[in-house]
Structure formats: structure tokens, C-alpha cells
């Protein structure tokens, strides 16, 4: 893990005026594109980036996405060392991770922990919620920093903590990198995020609902309504079907389904695994 620290602690982002706040960021290209959190730079008049070698740059805000709390910055620099991407879909519970950032202005701080949960929701603080949960210590100033695996690959952007005091109390949360990558790609190409929809109204299935609807599945996404003309209708999805997977990944909760859909653009084709209702027979 020590080698991971040396290779991956690259970007440190600061907001100006400095008494207004500080955060972290992740260099993703050699020519100066940086991911951070939207809440770090929101409402700022000027954003300054300080690299690990103490060079400072004024950053241009390329775009922001409050729904996922992701922002994309650009600095006028070349020859930077970008981080390598991992695959957040393949992260497993108990996997060791490192959180990198500037807690309390303590630059280049690295803490270790494990993945405690996936597809975690925090009660609707953001419109799209499907976080990686970890017990790596994250505090004010870590926002926008990297969550990396044991190979030093980026698997998430540290975003939130669950705490009554505002400081770390055992749980921290990161936006999955697969979601962040898609947001960044859209911000660069379109200036805003292109949201994919499948055209249904849905309920998250519980054993009680399964009993009420006389369904064999005890968990999944119950299709309560199919929107006329939408992608689901065109694919033959019916009311009463239960969504289980999207492109081979589990999608049995709202958070899991949101996380998978957030990786796609309108017009993309996805494979959906369903438990069919009797309407199909």
C-alpha cells in the first residue's frame, strides 16, 4: 500500500478565498483534467488548484452535475501523472481501499479501510444515490479526493460522511468511479449529463409486496407501470415483471438500478434480466 501512496497522491485542490473552504481532487489526464465534488466548488468565484509539488493553477470549471455531486475542472498544465481507473462494479465487500485527500488542510493524507457496503443510499441528499461505503477515515477537506483499491486504481470519489458532529465517525461514502467516468465524459462532450431512462414506474420489492402480488421473487424492482413509447415498452417489458439484473450486474434495489443506468447514455443498448409476470404467458 505504501507504493500505491507514492504513485497516486497527485492532486490537491483548494478553493479561493481560502477561508471559504478547501477540498481535494483527482488528476485524470496528462493535460490537466481533474475530478472533484460539485459541493466543493459550488458558488465559488475562483477555484485554485495546488499540486503535490506546490505548483498552483487557476482552474476552469468545465461542468458540474449536482445530481451525482461531480464536477470537472481543467488547469493549463501538461505532463501530469493521471490516476489509473478501476472498475467499481467489480468491487467486493471486505476489499481494502485507501482514501486520499486534504482533511483539515493536512495535505496528502492517506487513510485505509475496507468496503463495507455497495449501492448505499443516504436518504435522498442527492438525486442519484448509490455510494460505496467504507470505514476509511474521511473528514472535511477529503471531499473530491480519490478512493483507490490496493492496486492504486481509482474506484470512487470521496463525497460524504455519516456523522452527527460533521467529523468522521466510522462511515464514509464515495461516488462509484464508473458513474463518475460517465459524468465526466458527458460534461466534456455535451456540457451536461445525458441521463438514460428505461421508461417504467417501479417499486422496490419486499417480501410483503411479493406476497401481496403473488410473486416468486422476494427482491427486485417491480414494474408497476410501463410508459407508452419508452424503451421498456419497445423491449416487451410488462407490468408485473421484476427486474433482477442490468448487463449482468445485480439491480434489485433502486440504488443498484440507478448506479447501472447512470453509466449509460440515451441510445445505448443494455441487457436486462427479468422475472416475467404471468402476463407474458
Regions found by a protein language model. Give the residues of each.
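Serine-dependent protease modules
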Residues: 2-229, 233-235, 249, 254-269, ...
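Conserved catalytic motifs of ABC-family nucleotide-binding domains
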Residues: 240
Amino acid at each position: 500500500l505504501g507504493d500505491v501512496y507514492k504513485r497516486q497522491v497527485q492532486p490537491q485542490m483548494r478553493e479561493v478565498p481560502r477561508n471559504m473552504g478547501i477540498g481535494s481532487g483527482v488528476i485524470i489526464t496528462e493535460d490537466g483534467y481533474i475530478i472533484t465534488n460539485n459541493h466543493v466548488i459550488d458558488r465559488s468565484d475562483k477555484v485554485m488548484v495546488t499540486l503535490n509539488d506546490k505548483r498552483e493553477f487557476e482552474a476552469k470549471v468545465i461542468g458540474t452535475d449536482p445530481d451525482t455531486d461531480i464536477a470537472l475542472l481543467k488547469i493549463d498544465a501538461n505532463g501530469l501523472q493521471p490516476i489509473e481507473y478501476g472498475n467499481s462494479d467489480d468491487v467486493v465487500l471486505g476489499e481494502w481501499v485507501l482514501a486520499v485527500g486534504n482533511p483539515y488542510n493536512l495535505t496528502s493524507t492517506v487513510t485505509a479501510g475496507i468496503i463495507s457496503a455497495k449501492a448505499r443510499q443516504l436518504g435522498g441528499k442527492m438525486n442519484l444515490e448509490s455510494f460505496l461505503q467504507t470505514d476509511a477515515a474521511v473528514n472535511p477537506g477529503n471531499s473530491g479526493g480519490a478512493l483507490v483499491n490496493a492496486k492504486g486504481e481509482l474506484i470512487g470519489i470521496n463525497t460524504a460522511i455519516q456523522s452527527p458532529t460533521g467529523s468522521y465517525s466510522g462511515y464514509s461514502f464515495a461516488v462509484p468511479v464508473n458513474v463518475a467516468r460517465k459524468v465526466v465524459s458527458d460534461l466534456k462532450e455535451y456540457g451536461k449529463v445525458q441521463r438514460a431512462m428505461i421508461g417504467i414506474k417501479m417499486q422496490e420489492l419486499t417480501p410483503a409486496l411479493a406476497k401481496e402480488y403473488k410473486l416468486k421473487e422476494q427482491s427486485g424492482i417491480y414494474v408497476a407501470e410501463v410508459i407508452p413509447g419508452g424503451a421498456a415498452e419497445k423491449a416487451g417489458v410488462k407490468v408485473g415483471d421484476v427486474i433482477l439484473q442490468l448487463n449482468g450486474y445485480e439491480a434489485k434495489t433502486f440504488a443498484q438500478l440507478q448506479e447501472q443506468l447512470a453509466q449509460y447514455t440515451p441510445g445505448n443498448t443494455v441487457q436486462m434480466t427479468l422475472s416475467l409476470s404471468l402476463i407474458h404467458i
